[in-house]
A protein has these predicted regions:
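A basic/glycine-biased coupling hinge at the interface between accessory DNA-binding modules
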Residues: 1-83, 103
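Conserved helicase NTPase motor core
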Residues: 55-156, 174, 273
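Generic beta-sheet signal
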Residues: 106-108, 136, 235-239, 263, ...
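Short beta-strand/turn micro-motifs composed of small residues
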Residues: 140, 241, 283
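Helicase P-loop NTPase motor core
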Residues: 166-169, 174-263
Length: 309
């Protein structure tokens, strides 16, 4: 019921737990939910009390279903004398707040600040509280915030001064990743969200021809046939989709059908920091797996993650 009604997954009849594809998909979800519970750090009653009132009853039922898995995870950590990532941060905060460690650092530098969570922000606050001379230097870009699913809270970046005090802001407004034609499309898309910081984005290179084209997804094979005629062997073709299960079936025979092409497939999330000569994005349609994302979060994410921004 949880998977079919709330998550809207298609679950095969019979012994669905033997379905390997479903096992992999469910395993990643269970791992995420346990991680969110660990990041919260509180007792079960505290988690339930902190959930929005309109979902509290359902969340209470779901978290009770997850309780044995969380208990097993804690037991495994104890048996191996190990600590997970959330546990490390919680322990560090407690040690700092109890004065068992005095921070000697005057300068704290944080990269990828847009991916910071309230838990990690609390660690920064505890470090700064230990030393009144400490300064915080952060590099982040709210336009690249992609980790809310693991607890990142974008307002810690967009409202930086409210959270960490007054300071100087410096905009790095030149991108070296793409030409101006792609930049124009990216700018229009990102700035439709009023929650994003307004800032200029200038490309180092100016595009002299059309850089973005929309095609029907049925034309993917024909497009690769065309690219096979003029793409150089060293040029990379990167095909992206929202989820792994959206990988085009024709790529199974890519090595024999398009032997001259260097084709890679990745999820959009995993492609951050990558580059390619040609990028093809599939799955740009409405629906449960499409764009924009429908409300597909489970009650666990809705209760334990920061609010959607």
């Amino acid at each position: 019921q949880w998977l079919t009604e709330e998550m809207q997954w298609s679950v095969p009849e019979g012994n669905f737990w033997d379905d390997e594809k479903l096992q992999r998909r469910l395993a990643s979800r269970l791992d995420r939910w346990v991680s969110l519970m660990r990041m919260h750090g509180g007792a079960q009653a505290e988690m339930i009390a902190s959930a929005p009132e309109e979902i509290r009853d359902l969340f209470s039922k779901r978290i009770k279903l997850m309780a044995p898995l969380l208990k097993a995870w804690k037991g495994a950590l104890k048996a191996e004398n190990a600590v997970d990532f959330s546990g490390l941060i919680h322990q560090a905060i407690v040690i700092l707040e109890k004065g068992r460690f005095i921070s000697p650092w005057k300068h704290i530098l944080v990269d990828e600040f847009q991916d910071i969570s309230p838990q990690r922000a609390a660690l920064l606050a505890a470090l700064r509280k230990q030393n009144s001379q400490t300064t915080l230097f952060a590099v982040g870009d709210d336009w690249q915030a992609i980790y809310r699913f693991s607890g990142a809270q974008m307002s810690l970046t967009t409202a930086f001064h409210e959270n960490f005090g007054e300071g100087e802001r410096c905009d790095l407004d030149t991108t070296y990743r793409f030409n101006s034609r792609i930049g124009e499309v990216a700018n229009r898309f990102i700035q439709q969200n009023p929650g994003q910081l307004k800032k200029p984005l200038n490309s180092l290179t100016n595009g002299d021809k059309k850089a973005v084209t929309l095609l029907d997804e049925s034309q993917l094979d024909a497009l690769l046939d065309k690219l096979s005629g003029y793409a150089k062997p060293e040029e990379r073709i990167l095909i992206l989709a929202r989820y792994h299960h959206m990988r085009p079936a024709s790529l199974e025979k890519a090595a024999t059908r398009w032997p001259k092409l260097q084709i890679d497939f990745m999820t959009i999330h995993a492609s951050k920091g990558q580059q390619a000569d040609y990028v093809i994005i599939v799955g740009l349609q409405e629906g449960s797996d499409g764009f924009p994302a429908a409300a597909r979060e489970s009650i666990m994410e809705e209760a334990l993650l920061p609010p959607v921004e």
